[in-house]
Amino acid sequence: MATTVAIEVSNLSKSFKGKTAIKNVYCSINEGEMVALIGASGSGKSTLLRHINGLHIGDAGTVYIFGTVLQSKGKVHSKITSLRSQIGCIFQQFNLVNRLTVIENVLVGKLARLSILRSILRLFSKEEKAQALSALERVGIIEHAYKRASKLSGGQQQRVAIARCLVQGAKIILADEPIASLDPESARKVMELLVQLNRQSGITVVASLHQIQMVRSYFDRAIALRDGEVMFDGATVELDDKKLNEIYGTAAEELVMRGHGELLV
């Protein structure tokens, strides 16, 4: 069976106010892969993720989503909204609306697929609400469906964000430091949930992480950035101490698992 490429980034470069953020980045990620994005703070991880979902537009290079150009040479595809509907995003700060209930936050994932009127008025059908409840059950927090999002713990809020991706119908999940602000147990649950969605539903997952032990435990492949350039793309079993020091350089102290008190190199 032919392999489908979910994400392809070709010669992508971006500068902000004259400072290079990413330079000539190339990577290809197949549908159903689970890939860690690693590197020191400021290495370009978040910038790369934001180009993949079209939030940032590169100065040069091309991003393809399932073989269709999302952006190329500073221009976006005319149907970028449709392409982006295939990409779910979760962030360190969860990006929930605290005053809304959990189920209302999950239903936000449907907005891009609704008519303008239904989107503005947030008119959801019984079927759509049932889908939201099903997603909450799948991530293990259905009992919190009608609580305000602000009442949930950090780990629970991150699972709400994942449920939102499911309701959106995302084929790709981009996770930007999804466990950075979580306690060890919550971090483990979030990572296990992402692995479950990847293995059971074939959702392509790309996650930027600082916690190298998590990378080794949950990912088979890692892409490493240093100063905006790809300097490693391979199996996580190859990430020995020497390679990690090359990737992180003087920022090797970032390999301390935050909040876990464990030095990883």
From Swiss-Prot:
Bilayer disposition of the protein:
Peripheral membrane protein
**EC number of the protein:** 7.3.2.2
Provide the Gene Ontology terms for cellular component.
Answer: plasma membrane
Q: One matching Pfam family, short form? A: ABC_tran
Per UniProt, which keywords does this protein have?
A: ATP-binding, Cell inner membrane, Cell membrane, Membrane, Nucleotide-binding, Phosphonate transport, Translocase, Transport
| Compartment(s) | Cell inner membrane
**Primary location:** membrane
Which residue numbers delimit the ABC transporter domain?
A: 7-252
Q: Which GO terms describe its molecular function?
A: ABC-type phosphonate transporter activity; ATP binding; ATP hydrolysis activity
Q: Its catalytic activity? A: phosphonate(out) + ATP + H2O = phosphonate(in) + ADP + phosphate + H(+)
Question: Superkingdom of the source?
Answer: Bacteria
The entry's ATP-binding residues are G39, A40, S41, G42, S43, G44, K45, S46
- Subunit relationships: The complex is composed of two ATP-binding proteins (PhnC), two transmembrane proteins (PhnE) and a solute-binding protein (PhnD).
Family the entry assigns? Belongs to the ABC transporter superfamily. Phosphonates importer (TC 3.A.1.9.1) family.
Q: What does this protein do?
A: Part of the ABC transporter complex PhnCDE involved in phosphonates import. Responsible for energy coupling to the transport system.
Q: What is this protein called?
A: Phosphonates import ATP-binding protein PhnC 1
